[in-house]
């Protein structure tokens, strides 16, 4: 599920949706500018960074990771993501600031998947709709 959280000064929880409807896919808008759009090249780059990160030193329950272009932060992000034990992961929440508009609250996606060069990432639509309904 893709979430954007911002705390408002008044403490009010406000939410908006981004205009995508169920069944719609969001394109990889930064492919070829922030990371390779070639699946084999991208997989090779990510694998190289993860290999260079060394052994896992713990088991992450949450990760705070940079999200700039991979050429700037791929190696740093790999150290964080190396701590993930994939078989222990039930759900992934992506939290990030909006770089496009100023939000007074948070935005929830209504698209059902994100297209990436490595394949589609499916959104937990039930979890997303429950989050929207509860306004939390």
Residue ranges and their predicted role:
Residues 3-17:
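Bacterial Sec-dependent signal peptides at the C-terminal "C-region" and cleavage site
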Residues 18-136:
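Active-site histidine-anchored catalytic micro-motif
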Residues 1-4, 113:
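Intrinsic disorder/low-structure terminal segments
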